[in-house]
Amino acid sequence: MTDNLNFTMKFDLDKDKEKKAREIIFTVYQSLEEKGYNPTNQFVGYILSGDPTYITSHNNARSLIRQIERDELLEELLKSYLNTK
C-alpha cells in the first residue's frame, strides 16, 4: 500500500468521451443562458456540490449533465481554459 504513494496515478479520458463531454457542456451552457441563468455560476455550483438542481431541466440539460462525471466535466473545462490562454 505504501509503495503506491511513490507513483503518480494517470487519469485519461478517451477521445469519444471528450467529444461527448464537450458537446454536453455546450448544450447545457446554452440552455442555462436561455433560461436567464449565469452558466458559470451554475456550473461551479454543480461541480462543487454534485447537486443536479444547479442545472436547468430546460432542453433536457439536467439529464445530459448527469451523463458525464464531474471529474470529466472539470477536465474539459480546464483544457478549454488553458487552450484559450
UniProtKB/Swiss-Prot annotation:
Q: Which InterPro entries match?
A: IreB
Q: Which residues cross the membrane?
A: none
Please indicate which superkingdom the organism of origin belongs to.
Answer: Bacteria
Which N-terminal stretch is annotated as signal sequence?
A: none
What protein family does this chain belong to?
A: Belongs to the UPF0297 family.
The protein here is known as UPF0297 protein Clos_1665
Species the sequence originates in: Alkaliphilus oremlandii (strain OhILAs)
